Amino acid sequence: MRLLGLDVGSKTVGVAISDPLGITAQELETIKIDESKFSFGMRQIRKLVRKYDVEGFVLGLPKNMDGSSGHSVERSKQYGERLKEKFDLPVHYMDERLTTVQADRILVQEAGVHDRVERKKVIDQMAAVLILQSYLEATRKDK
């Protein structure tokens, strides 16, 4: 069962895909979006759903450190509702506190990407990988 992991931001959506067995997550791409123009990248997501035979989505919920929800959580939930309407596939949510910070640390310390411009190109994808991998591990433990 393949899942798409999505890190939804105000200007981009980082995308990751699970392997067919649902064990690991790999980065795919970053999709540019523009809320003011109602451009949410659904055409590109449709291509990915078809290409990889996706059976569901995992979106990060960027809660505040105290566990409360802010505007970013609402944006992710609205995006999830849009996905449900367009694709009629299940949408799961995963707490994503600090995934972007963690992704940045991994890119610098483990991948040796010190240039901020280069990190910015892939940080959303890396955050999507962390969100999806966390979900895959959590659901595997539940089985």
Swiss-Prot record:
Signal sequence, start to end: none
Enzyme kind, highest EC tier: hydrolase
Family annotation (InterPro entries): RNaseH-like_sf, YqgF, YqgF/RNaseH-like_dom, YqgF/RNaseH-like_dom_sf
Gene Ontology molecular function terms on file: nuclease activity
Keyword S-adenosyl-L-methionine among record annotations: no
Top-level division of the source organism's lineage: Bacteria
Gene3D superfamilies: YqgF/RNase H-like domain
Keyword terms, alphabetized: Cytoplasm, Hydrolase, Nuclease, Ribosome biogenesis
Pfam families noted in UniProt: RuvX (PF03652)
BP terms from Gene Ontology: rRNA 5'-end processing
Record-linked SMART domains: YqgFc (SM00732)
Subcellular location: Cytoplasm
Any one of the GO CC terms: cytosol
EC number: 3.1.-.-
Keyword Manganese applies: no
Function: Could be a nuclease involved in processing of the 5'-end of pre-16S rRNA.
Recorded family membership: Belongs to the YqgF nuclease family.
HAMAP family recorded: Nuclease_YqgF
Protein name: Putative pre-16S rRNA nuclease
Lineage, uppermost ranks: Bacteria, Bacillati, Bacillota, Bacilli, Lactobacillales
